[in-house]
Protein backbone atom coordinates (compact mmCIF):
# COMPACT_ATOMS: atom_id res chain seq x y z
CA UNK A 1 0.00 0.00 0.00
CA UNK A 2 2.97 2.31 0.57
CA UNK A 3 5.04 1.26 -2.45
CA UNK A 4 4.94 2.10 -6.15
CA UNK A 5 5.37 0.13 -9.36
CA UNK A 6 8.91 0.41 -10.76
CA UNK A 7 9.30 -0.95 -14.28
CA UNK A 8 13.09 -1.22 -14.01
CA UNK A 9 12.93 -2.97 -10.63
CA UNK A 10 10.74 -5.92 -11.67
CA UNK A 11 13.35 -7.79 -13.79
CA UNK A 12 15.97 -7.34 -11.08
CA UNK A 13 13.71 -8.85 -8.45
CA UNK A 14 12.56 -11.59 -10.81
CA UNK A 15 16.16 -12.72 -11.32
CA UNK A 16 16.52 -13.19 -7.56
CA UNK A 17 13.86 -15.91 -7.49
CA UNK A 18 16.37 -18.47 -8.76
CA UNK A 19 18.34 -18.03 -5.52
CA UNK A 20 17.65 -19.23 -1.97
CA UNK A 21 16.61 -16.07 -0.12
CA UNK A 22 15.66 -17.56 3.26
CA UNK A 23 18.61 -15.78 4.86
CA UNK A 24 18.09 -12.57 2.93
CA UNK A 25 19.75 -11.09 -0.13
CA UNK A 26 23.58 -11.05 0.07
CA UNK A 27 25.06 -7.55 0.13
CA UNK A 28 27.11 -8.37 -2.97
CA UNK A 29 23.89 -8.93 -4.94
CA UNK A 30 22.29 -5.81 -3.48
CA UNK A 31 25.29 -3.76 -4.60
CA UNK A 32 25.51 -5.40 -8.03
CA UNK A 33 21.83 -4.77 -8.79
CA UNK A 34 21.69 -1.36 -7.18
CA UNK A 35 18.78 -2.42 -4.98
CA UNK A 36 19.80 0.00 -2.26
CA UNK A 37 18.62 2.82 -4.55
CA UNK A 38 15.00 1.74 -4.08
CA UNK A 39 12.74 2.30 -1.12
CA UNK A 40 11.91 -0.85 0.87
CA UNK A 41 8.21 -0.22 0.24
CA UNK A 42 8.80 -0.15 -3.53
CA UNK A 43 10.77 -3.41 -3.36
CA UNK A 44 7.93 -5.04 -1.41
CA UNK A 45 5.30 -3.70 -3.83
CA UNK A 46 7.07 -5.05 -6.90
CA UNK A 47 7.92 -8.37 -5.26
CA UNK A 48 4.20 -8.74 -4.54
CA UNK A 49 3.46 -8.22 -8.25
CA UNK A 50 5.83 -11.05 -9.17
CA UNK A 51 4.36 -13.33 -6.50
CA UNK A 52 0.79 -12.74 -7.64
CA UNK A 53 1.75 -13.32 -11.27
CA UNK A 54 3.40 -16.64 -10.45
CA UNK A 55 0.49 -17.78 -8.29
CA UNK A 56 -2.00 -16.88 -11.00
CA UNK A 57 -0.14 -19.15 -13.41
CA UNK A 58 -0.06 -22.04 -10.95
CA UNK A 59 -3.76 -21.66 -10.19
CA UNK A 60 -4.64 -21.57 -13.89
CA UNK A 61 -3.05 -25.02 -14.21
CA UNK A 62 -4.85 -26.28 -11.10
CA UNK A 63 -8.20 -25.02 -12.36
CA UNK A 64 -7.75 -27.06 -15.55
CA UNK A 65 -7.98 -30.14 -13.32
CA UNK A 66 -10.69 -29.08 -10.87
CA UNK A 67 -12.94 -26.15 -10.04
CA UNK A 68 -12.03 -26.54 -6.36
CA UNK A 69 -8.59 -25.62 -5.06
CA UNK A 70 -6.97 -26.40 -1.71
CA UNK A 71 -3.98 -24.13 -1.13
CA UNK A 72 -1.21 -24.31 1.47
CA UNK A 73 2.32 -23.25 2.34
CA UNK A 74 3.60 -20.22 4.20
CA UNK A 75 2.84 -18.07 1.17
CA UNK A 76 -0.86 -18.79 1.77
CA UNK A 77 -0.67 -16.28 4.63
CA UNK A 78 -0.35 -13.52 2.03
CA UNK A 79 -3.86 -12.11 2.35
CA UNK A 80 -3.58 -9.68 -0.56
CA UNK A 81 -2.71 -12.50 -2.96
CA UNK A 82 -5.33 -14.77 -1.39
CA UNK A 83 -8.11 -12.31 -2.20
CA UNK A 84 -7.16 -12.30 -5.88
CA UNK A 85 -6.90 -16.08 -5.92
CA UNK A 86 -10.33 -16.28 -4.28
CA UNK A 87 -11.76 -14.31 -7.21
CA UNK A 88 -9.81 -16.40 -9.71
CA UNK A 89 -11.34 -19.56 -8.20
CA UNK A 90 -14.80 -17.95 -8.06
CA UNK A 91 -14.86 -18.56 -4.32
CA UNK A 92 -14.01 -22.28 -4.55
CA UNK A 93 -10.78 -21.93 -2.56
CA UNK A 94 -9.92 -23.47 0.81
CA UNK A 95 -6.84 -22.53 2.82
CA UNK A 96 -5.88 -24.38 5.99
CA UNK A 97 -5.88 -22.00 9.00
CA UNK A 98 -2.27 -22.95 9.70
CA UNK A 99 -0.91 -23.28 6.14
CA UNK A 100 2.82 -22.98 6.90
CA UNK A 101 5.34 -25.62 7.96
CA UNK A 102 3.85 -25.87 11.46
CA UNK A 103 0.48 -26.84 10.03
CA UNK A 104 2.07 -29.75 8.21
CA UNK A 105 2.35 -31.54 11.55
CA UNK A 106 -1.41 -32.00 11.64
CA UNK A 107 -1.39 -33.25 8.07
CA UNK A 108 1.32 -35.77 8.95
CA UNK A 109 -0.72 -36.96 11.93
CA UNK A 110 -3.82 -37.34 9.75
CA UNK A 111 -1.82 -39.29 7.18
CA UNK A 112 -0.45 -41.61 9.88
CA UNK A 113 -3.96 -42.04 11.30
CA UNK A 114 -5.01 -43.34 7.92
CA UNK A 115 -8.68 -42.43 8.17
CA UNK A 116 -10.82 -39.51 7.03
CA UNK A 117 -10.65 -36.64 9.50
CA UNK A 118 -13.59 -34.25 9.73
CA UNK A 119 -12.27 -30.72 10.11
CA UNK A 120 -14.50 -28.72 12.44
CA UNK A 121 -12.44 -25.79 13.73
CA UNK A 122 -8.87 -24.68 14.52
CA UNK A 123 -9.35 -24.55 18.31
CA UNK A 124 -7.06 -27.46 19.15
CA UNK A 125 -4.69 -26.01 21.74
CA UNK A 126 -4.53 -25.69 25.52
CA UNK A 127 -7.99 -25.22 27.03
CA UNK A 128 -8.81 -22.49 29.57
CA UNK A 129 -12.20 -23.09 31.13
CA UNK A 130 -14.23 -19.86 31.48
CA UNK A 131 -14.38 -18.48 35.02
CA UNK A 132 -18.14 -17.92 34.74
CA UNK A 133 -21.03 -18.53 32.32
CA UNK A 134 -20.23 -17.38 28.79
CA UNK A 135 -22.92 -14.70 28.55
CA UNK A 136 -21.96 -13.18 31.89
CA UNK A 137 -18.28 -13.17 30.94
CA UNK A 138 -19.03 -11.66 27.52
CA UNK A 139 -20.99 -8.89 29.21
CA UNK A 140 -18.04 -8.06 31.51
CA UNK A 141 -15.66 -8.02 28.54
CA UNK A 142 -17.81 -5.63 26.52
CA UNK A 143 -18.36 -3.28 29.46
CA UNK A 144 -14.59 -3.15 29.94
CA UNK A 145 -13.91 -2.42 26.26
CA UNK A 146 -16.49 0.37 26.28
CA UNK A 147 -14.84 1.93 29.33
CA UNK A 148 -11.14 1.39 28.62
CA UNK A 149 -11.02 0.81 24.86
CA UNK A 150 -9.54 -2.68 24.91
CA UNK A 151 -8.96 -5.91 26.83
CA UNK A 152 -7.49 -9.37 26.43
CA UNK A 153 -9.48 -12.60 26.17
CA UNK A 154 -8.07 -16.05 26.99
CA UNK A 155 -10.98 -18.48 27.02
CA UNK A 156 -11.37 -21.98 25.61
CA UNK A 157 -8.86 -23.96 23.51
CA UNK A 158 -6.06 -21.94 21.92
CA UNK A 159 -6.07 -21.50 18.15
CA UNK A 160 -3.89 -23.82 16.06
CA UNK A 161 -2.20 -21.36 13.76
CA UNK A 162 -0.76 -17.84 13.56
CA UNK A 163 -4.10 -15.98 13.73
CA UNK A 164 -5.88 -15.18 16.98
CA UNK A 165 -9.58 -15.76 16.30
CA UNK A 166 -11.12 -14.79 19.62
CA UNK A 167 -9.80 -17.34 22.11
CA UNK A 168 -6.39 -15.70 22.64
CA UNK A 169 -7.16 -12.18 21.44
CA UNK A 170 -6.61 -8.55 22.25
CA UNK A 171 -9.92 -6.84 21.43
CA UNK A 172 -10.54 -3.13 20.95
CA UNK A 173 -13.11 -0.62 19.73
CA UNK A 174 -12.49 -0.12 15.98
CA UNK A 175 -14.42 3.13 15.67
CA UNK A 176 -11.62 5.55 16.48
CA UNK A 177 -7.93 5.98 15.70
CA UNK A 178 -7.14 6.20 19.42
CA UNK A 179 -7.62 2.46 19.92
CA UNK A 180 -5.25 1.69 17.04
CA UNK A 181 -2.54 3.84 18.62
CA UNK A 182 -3.10 2.23 22.03
CA UNK A 183 -2.86 -1.31 20.68
CA UNK A 184 0.17 -0.47 18.51
CA UNK A 185 1.94 0.94 21.56
CA UNK A 186 1.20 -2.12 23.69
CA UNK A 187 2.15 -4.60 20.97
CA UNK A 188 5.21 -2.57 19.89
CA UNK A 189 4.20 -2.72 16.24
CA UNK A 190 5.07 -0.34 13.43
CA UNK A 191 2.45 2.38 13.19
CA UNK A 192 1.63 1.65 9.55
CA UNK A 193 0.56 -1.95 10.17
CA UNK A 194 -3.22 -2.43 10.07
CA UNK A 195 -5.34 -4.44 12.48
CA UNK A 196 -8.01 -6.96 11.57
CA UNK A 197 -11.74 -6.54 12.10
CA UNK A 198 -13.95 -9.36 13.33
CA UNK A 199 -17.51 -9.03 12.04
CA UNK A 200 -20.70 -11.05 12.03
CA UNK A 201 -20.83 -13.16 8.88
CA UNK A 202 -24.35 -11.91 8.25
CA UNK A 203 -23.26 -8.25 8.63
CA UNK A 204 -20.25 -8.28 6.30
CA UNK A 205 -22.10 -6.36 3.59
CA UNK A 206 -22.86 -3.51 6.00
CA UNK A 207 -19.19 -2.63 6.41
CA UNK A 208 -17.21 -4.34 3.64
CA UNK A 209 -17.33 -5.26 -0.03
CA UNK A 210 -19.77 -8.19 -0.29
CA UNK A 211 -18.88 -11.69 -1.39
CA UNK A 212 -16.22 -12.69 1.12
CA UNK A 213 -16.50 -15.21 3.95
CA UNK A 214 -13.19 -15.44 5.80
CA UNK A 215 -13.43 -17.15 9.21
CA UNK A 216 -9.65 -17.49 9.54
CA UNK A 217 -8.47 -13.97 8.56
CA UNK A 218 -7.12 -15.09 5.20
CA UNK A 219 -8.25 -12.34 2.82
CA UNK A 220 -8.44 -8.57 2.50
CA UNK A 221 -11.55 -6.76 1.28
CA UNK A 222 -12.48 -3.13 0.69
CA UNK A 223 -13.85 -1.44 3.79
CA UNK A 224 -16.92 0.62 2.88
CA UNK A 225 -17.55 2.01 6.38
CA UNK A 226 -15.71 5.30 7.08
CA UNK A 227 -16.42 4.94 10.80
CA UNK A 228 -13.88 2.13 11.26
CA UNK A 229 -10.46 3.81 10.93
CA UNK A 230 -8.68 1.48 13.38
CA UNK A 231 -9.13 -1.53 11.09
CA UNK A 232 -8.81 0.17 7.68
CA UNK A 233 -5.43 0.12 5.92
CA UNK A 234 -4.05 3.02 3.90
CA UNK A 235 -5.31 1.40 0.69
CA UNK A 236 -8.85 1.16 2.07
CA UNK A 237 -8.79 -2.59 2.73
CA UNK A 238 -9.27 -4.72 5.83
CA UNK A 239 -8.15 -8.27 6.67
CA UNK A 240 -11.50 -9.53 7.87
CA UNK A 241 -12.52 -12.35 10.16
CA UNK A 242 -16.13 -13.39 9.65
CA UNK A 243 -17.86 -14.90 12.69
CA UNK A 244 -20.74 -17.26 11.96
CA UNK A 245 -23.76 -18.13 14.08
CA UNK A 246 -22.21 -21.58 14.59
CA UNK A 247 -18.95 -20.22 16.02
CA UNK A 248 -18.04 -22.69 18.83
CA UNK A 249 -16.27 -20.13 21.04
CA UNK A 250 -17.03 -17.20 23.35
CA UNK A 251 -16.30 -14.77 20.53
CA UNK A 252 -19.78 -14.86 19.02
CA UNK A 253 -21.27 -14.01 22.43
CA UNK A 254 -18.83 -11.10 22.81
CA UNK A 255 -19.75 -9.68 19.40
CA UNK A 256 -23.46 -10.06 20.13
CA UNK A 257 -23.09 -8.19 23.42
CA UNK A 258 -20.94 -5.53 21.71
CA UNK A 259 -23.54 -4.92 19.01
CA UNK A 260 -26.33 -4.82 21.60
CA UNK A 261 -24.55 -2.10 23.58
CA UNK A 262 -23.00 -0.07 20.74
CA UNK A 263 -24.94 -0.84 17.57
CA UNK A 264 -21.64 -1.83 15.93
CA UNK A 265 -21.06 -5.43 14.81
CA UNK A 266 -17.29 -5.06 14.37
CA UNK A 267 -14.42 -5.42 16.85
CA UNK A 268 -10.69 -4.94 16.34
CA UNK A 269 -9.07 -8.35 16.88
CA UNK A 270 -5.36 -9.00 17.20
CA UNK A 271 -3.28 -11.68 18.88
CA UNK A 272 -2.74 -11.63 22.64
CA UNK A 273 1.01 -11.28 22.57
CA UNK A 274 3.78 -8.72 22.20
CA UNK A 275 5.96 -8.52 19.10
CA UNK A 276 8.52 -11.31 19.19
CA UNK A 277 6.75 -13.31 21.91
CA UNK A 278 4.41 -16.31 21.62
CA UNK A 279 0.70 -15.89 22.19
CA UNK A 280 -0.73 -16.22 25.68
CA UNK A 281 -1.42 -19.92 26.21
CA UNK A 282 -2.46 -20.63 29.80
CA UNK A 283 -3.72 -18.71 32.84
CA UNK A 284 -0.19 -18.01 34.07
CA UNK A 285 0.62 -16.40 30.72
CA UNK A 286 -2.58 -14.34 30.91
CA UNK A 287 -1.77 -13.10 34.41
CA UNK A 288 1.78 -12.24 33.37
CA UNK A 289 0.53 -10.31 30.33
CA UNK A 290 -1.92 -8.33 32.46
CA UNK A 291 0.67 -7.50 35.10
CA UNK A 292 3.44 -6.60 32.66
CA UNK A 293 1.47 -4.57 30.12
CA UNK A 294 -1.41 -3.23 32.19
CA UNK A 295 -4.13 -4.73 30.01
CA UNK A 296 -6.97 -6.59 31.69
CA UNK A 297 -7.17 -10.20 30.46
CA UNK A 298 -10.45 -12.03 30.98
CA UNK A 299 -10.63 -15.80 31.38
Language-model region placement:
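Flexible beta->alpha loop and helix N-cap segments adjacent to enzyme active/binding sites
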Residues: 1-27, 77-78, 82-299
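Secondary-structure capping and boundary motifs in well-ordered enzyme cores
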Residues: 40-43, 47, 51, 73, ...
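Phosphate/ATP-binding catalytic cores across multiple sugar-kinase/actin-like superfamilies
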Residues: 45-69
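Short glycine-rich phosphate-binding loop at a beta-alpha junction
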Residues: 65-74, 152
Amino acid sequence: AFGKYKKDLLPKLFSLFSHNLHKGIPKSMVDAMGLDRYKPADIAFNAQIILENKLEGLFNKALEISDNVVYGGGVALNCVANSKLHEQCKGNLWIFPNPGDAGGSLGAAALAYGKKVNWEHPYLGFNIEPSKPIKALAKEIVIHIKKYGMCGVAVGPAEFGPRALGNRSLLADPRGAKAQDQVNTIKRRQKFRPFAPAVFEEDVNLHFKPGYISPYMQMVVDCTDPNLPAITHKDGTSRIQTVSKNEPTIFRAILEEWKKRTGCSVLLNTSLNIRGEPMVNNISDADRFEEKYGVKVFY
